[in-house]
From Swiss-Prot:
It comes from Homo sapiens. Residues 585-651 form a coiled coil. The lineage of its organism: Eukaryota, Metazoa, Chordata, Craniata, Vertebrata. The gene is NUP88. Component of nuclear pore complex. This is Nuclear pore complex protein Nup88. InterPro entries: Nucleoporin_Nup88 (IPR019321), NUP88/NUP82 (IPR037700). One of its GO terms (cellular component) is nucleoplasm.
Length: 741
């Protein structure tokens, strides 16, 4: 489902040399030098309200533009490894080349998480006792490296809420995130142990711009559950939050008048008892709009335990409608669809007078998934560590595939793919009004869970939580990068889409030389045999990659190795061999049916060939008969024409055409006589004209003889008259131009 299989391409060469890079050797040496010192620290040095530092699920790795950033806690710096070569590909560079980003003002607390801002210009350094923001330096040069490719670069850091954490020693930071807007100034959202959410701007990092007090939800927000006061008195606090995609909400939700809508981000807040609250935040206009706290959101179908009392993480997948993933420390995942509330809800009837009641959505628990935090060994069912092990779970979005997310915890890494999102969209687009039928929809096709990495293979071993997790989404290829507790780099190529956890079938392999069969196109139905085989081969449990625990110098006893071997053998037997045998039986049964169908179709084909041969012979005989009949018909037509001609010629009376011809022949002599008279008249006129012309031509022509003096006088007079006429024309043109002006 998550890991891709196949040969390594040209763009994936970096996956082979990255684990051998010198930065991991440097981090491992720093870990060796740091371990004896940490062992001598007293147990009282760690905060009682926080888990032990070595058991924290850290994430001190992130990527940006083909570069991998690793946090070095010993030097308080980032080690930047360039995954792309000078030409922009993934070719192997020098394994000793990297850049160091030093903090000018290093943090005084331990960093367990780093977050890249939406604008990709700042990095949040998150610890239990504070938060600091590092500003990434400028890039320039041929390869667009930091400050032209210097080996060491100083970076400015900005402490956020430093005075607040310094003055309140008992408070801890439980969750932190960036405000998801890319067009506004960077804002950091903090959830502290006093059950308050504070929003800080980097322009004023010591004073919160907005504060959301969660402990006073009963007095300042719309409460749908009367028993919420008793729950708050028991000390239930928020443990995590997550932003959803932009949504348009009315101004009345922010306490403003008007019917217009405001674009805001929904903020889903998860409490430890499993309840979820909702508020809307818009920082577009200073100082920002914070909506009233709505909730707890009703969950359907209802459960007595409210779907667990150990909730630890929430994730909002970027789709419409929103899908919330709620994780518990026991390894349960709840996929909840956020839909509009129903009118017949009992809670809404109590507060029907409030206009904001329509804005409270409901959470429809589409499905529940249980993660295998610790491996269920074949002979370890009675081991208490196997059933009682629990740990916080962190949820990570997949930037390449919106319908997939990843889970990290102390015992390893899981990937979860939701293949029913498109069916959910089709269901919501239909005219169905019964939203409870979502449960029936969830039984058709469940999500796929893949156990990628196991860092706690044995119940008696201490877990070795990973230190970094990142998904490379760019042109280098979707890849999962995990940094173990000993700074080993593990890489798994990912698929771009969610696929079932079953091996690929032969019929799904692409072959450009073989044309697609039209029958295969017709066979692409929801109940096709290919999908049936996929459902049989679908695996619910897999053998993850094992990682040595923190006690790496102590070899496990043979009994524990036998347990792991037995577990792996059982998984291979049940999830691979047994299902392949079932698929083999189905394929053999299908082959037998297809052979019978082929035999019957061959018989039908031979019968059709015989019929075609007989039809062709019959068509040839009919064609010959047609030609003979056509020739006979032409002969008969010619004989009929001759017969009619002879018949008409021997008739005793004239026909109509013959009568007309007779009349025309009788009129011809009269017409000839008239034409002869007309010719005589024309001839006489011609002779008369010739006589007249001869008389005119015979008359003598008068001649005028001028002397030289007369010709000269006439020429001079004509010349003077011409000049006079020219002057008059010129005067007339001048007068005309003057008048027109």
């Amino acid at each position: 489902m998550a890991a891709a299989e196949g040969p390594v391409g040209d763009g994936e060469l970096w996956q082979t040399w990255l684990p051998n890079h010198v930065v991991f050797l440097r981090l491992r040496e720093g870990l060796k030098n740091q371990s004896p010192t940490e062992a001598e620290k007293p147990a009282s040095s760690s905060l009682p309200s926080s888990p032990p530092p070595q058991l924290l699920t850290r994430n001190v790795v992130f990527g940006l533009g083909g570069e991998l950033f690793l946090w070095d806690g010993e030097d308080s710096s980032f080690l930047v490894v360039r995954l792309r070569g000078p030409s922009g590909g993934g070719e192997e560079p020098a394994l000793s080349q990297y850049q160091r980003l030093l903090c000018i003002n290093p943090p005084l607390f331990e960093i367990y998480q780093v977050l890249l801002s939406p604008t990709q210009h700042h990095v949040a350094l998150i610890g239990i006792k504070g938060l600091m923001v590092l500003e990434l330096p400028k890039r320039w040069g041929k390869n667009s490296e930091f400050e032209g490719g210097k080996s060491t670069v100083n970076c400015s850091t900005t402490p956020v809420a430093e005075r607040f954490f310094t003055s309140s020693t008992s408070l801890t930071l439980k969750h932190a995130a960036w405000y998801p807007s890319e067009i506004l100034d960077p804002h950091v959202v903090l959830l502290t142990s006093d059950n308050v959410i504070r929003i800080y701007s980097l322009r004023e990092p010591q004073t919160p711009t907005n504060v959301i007090i969660l402990s006073e939800a009963e007095e300042e927000s719309l409460v749908l559950n009367k028993g919420r006061a008793y729950t708050a008195s028991l000390g239930e606090t928020a443990v995590a939050f997550d932003f959803g995609p932009l949504a348009a909400v009315p101004k009345t939700l922010f306490g403003q008048n008007g019917k217009d809508e405001v674009v805001a981000y929904p903020l889903y807040i998860l409490y430890e008892n499993g309840e979820t609250f909702l508020t809307y935040i818009s920082l577009l206009h200073s100082p920002g709009n914070i909506g009233k706290l709505l909730g707890p959101l009703p969950m359907h179908p209802a459960a007595e335990d409210n779907y667990g009392y150990d909730a630890c993480a929430v994730l909002c997948l970027p789709c419409v409608p929103n899908i919330l993933v709620i994780a518990t420390e026991s390894g349960m995942l709840y996929h909840c669809v956020v839909l509009e509330g129903e009118e017949e809800d009992d809670h809404t009837s109590e507060k029907s007078w409030d206009s904001r009641i329509d804005l409270i959505p409901s959470l429809y628990v589409f499905e529940c998934v249980e993660l295998e935090l610790a491996l269920k060994l074949a002979s370890g069912e009675d081991d208490p560590f196997d059933s009682d092990f629990s740990c916080p779970v962190k949820l990570h979005r997949d930037p390449k595939c919106p319908s997939r997310y990843h889970c990290t915890h102390e015992a390893g890494v899981h990937s979860v793919g939701l293949t029913w999102i498109h069916k959910l969209h089709k269901f919501l687009g239909s005219d169905e009004e019964d939203k409870d039928s979502l449960q029936e929809l969830s039984t058709e096709q469940k999500c796929f869970v893949e156990h990628i990495l196991c860092t706690k293979p044995l119940p008696c071993r201490q877990p070795a939580p990973i230190r970094g997790f990142w998904i490379v989404p760019d042109i280098l290829g979707p890849t999962m990068i995990c940094i173990t507790s000993t700074y080993e780099c593990l890489i798994w190529p990912l698929l771009s889409t969610v696929h079932p956890a079953s091996p690929p079938l032969l019929c799904t392999r692409e072959d450009v030389e073989v044309a697609e069969s039209p029958l295969r196109v017709l066979a692409e139905t929801p109940d096709s045999f290919e999908k049936h085989i996929r459902s049989i081969l679908q695996r619910s449990v897999a053998n993850p990659a094992f990682l040595k625990a923190s006690e790496k110098d102590i070899a496990p006893p043979p009994e524990e190795c036998l347990q792991l071997l037995s577990r792996a053998t059982q998984v291979f037997r049940e999830q691979y061999i047994l299902k392949q045998d079932l698929a083999k039986e189905e394929i053999q049964r299908r082959v037998k049916l297809l052979c019978d169908q082929k035999k019957k179709q061959l018989e039908d084909l031979s019968y059709c060939r015989e019929e075609r041969k007989s039809l062709r012979e019959m068509a040839e005989r009919l064609a010959d008969k047609y030609e003979e009949a056509k020739e006979k018909q032409e002969d008969i037509m010619n004989r009929m024409k001759k017969l009619l001609h002879s018949f008409h010629s021997e008739l005793p009376v004239l026909s109509d055409s013959e009568r007309d011809m007779k009349k025309e022949l009788q009129l011809i002599p009269d017409q000839l006589r008239h034409l002869g008279n007309a010719i005589k008249q024309v001839t006489m006129k011609k002779d008369y004209q010739q006589q007249k012309m001869e008389k005119v031509l015979s008359l003598p022509k008068p001649t005028i003889i001028l002397s030289a003096y007369q010709r000269k006088c006439i020429q001079s007079i004509l010349k003077e008259e011409g000049e006079h006429i020219r002057e008059m024309v010129k005067q007339i043109n001048d007068i005309r131009n003057h008048v027109n002006f």
